[in-house]
C-alpha cells in the first residue's frame, strides 16, 4: 500500500556532511526550522536511528513540551526510534499552540503541507527511512493525525492517534486505505468516545462545535479499507488494552481499535503496543 520514491530528496540524502551538521543543530530545546513552522527532536543515545515517530501535541501544547512526558519519550527512544514533535501555531491571546485540523473550518496554516515538510526534513537531514515513520498524536493531535490520514493516506506508512479523532461534521469518506491504530480511554471525559458538544445547544446546530464519535470514525476507516464485515475479526483482552482488529480488508491495509481503563491520557504501555503493531505490519 505504501510506496514512496521521494526522488526530490535524493540530493539531500547524498549530502552527508551537510545533513549531519544540520541534524545536530536540532534538539529537544532548539527547533529544526522548516517551511511554515518548526519541530523538535530527541534521538537515542549513541545511535543513528533510521526509524521515527512524529508526535503531534494537543491543544495548548508545543513541540518542545512533548518531551516533558518522559515516559513517552524514553519508551520511544529505548526502541531505537527518533522522536520528532512539531509545534502547532501559537493561538492569539492564549498560551500554547493548536492545529487547523478540520477542513471545514478556518485554516491558519496548511497543516498537511507543514507536517509533510517535517517528514521530508527528517528524511533529508536525519537519514530516516520514509517507510519507517509512524505519525501519532494526542487529543487534538490525534484529530490532526486522523484528518491527515484521511485526506492524504500515503503521506506516512501508518498512523496511531490517541484520544482524538474526527469532529462533527464527520468526513463523508477518505482518499484511500490506511494502516491505523486508534487508542482511546474508556472513561475519557475530555474527548469521550461518543464526542462532546463544546459550543451550541445541539450537535446539529449550524455553527455548533462538537467532537465526533469514535465508533463512527471506525466505520469511516472500515469503508476506506473496504473491510468485509462491520464486526472485528480479532479480539484481545489479555493485556492492559482491549483490542479489536479488522483483517478482512484491502491487502496492505490495517485497522485496529485499542481501549484502556482510563481517561484522557497517553496510557502507560502505549508506545510498546503501538511500536509492536507498527513493526509487525
Show the residue positions of the predicted features.
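C-terminal catalytic histidine-bearing segment of alpha/beta-hydrolase fold enzymes
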Residues: 179-183, 211-212, 222-281
